[in-house]
């Protein structure tokens, strides 16, 4: 396109797929960092606890941690000051208050910042997550899981991240 000078990523990328691609993943990340981020890149680790990530069909948190460290390292090497905006979900089926407390500690210890993008899980039609929400069972094993259905407690889960452990 002749009049387009730059293209920036506005909605984010799948961090889990970047480093999984051992042929082009690192090259792709460097290209994005060098030319296609306007200061912040959105990513969705969604949680820190592996058992919640498994219910979401996502890889273990070590995958995100590796991406996060790689992102920071490449930015340092390129002399750039760019940041990740992380999106998390509270009250996902299987998620307890204790899981959110662990997520809060993960954010302080690993990310070293308090994320602002926290959404309370909302059931949507025809998804494994909604099936788990209504049945209280893991979609893959049929085992019983905790599901927070009280609106106040869902807000408390969210506020654990937004306000810290006192929330």
Regions found by a protein language model. Name each.
Residues 1-85, 90-93:
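Conserved SAM/AdoMet-binding glycine-rich loop
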Residues 17-20, 46-58, 79-98, 111-148, ...:
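Flexible glycine/acidic-rich beta-alpha junction loops that bind and position SAM and/or redox cofactors
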Residues 24, 98-101:
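Short, glycine/acidic-rich beta->alpha junctions
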Residues 33, 108-109:
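Non-catalytic positions within long, well-ordered alpha-helices that form the structural scaffold/packing
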Residues 101-102, 106, 114:
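N-terminal intrinsically disordered, low-complexity, charge/repeat-rich segments that act as generic
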Residues 167:
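Acidic, glycine-enriched active-site microenvironments
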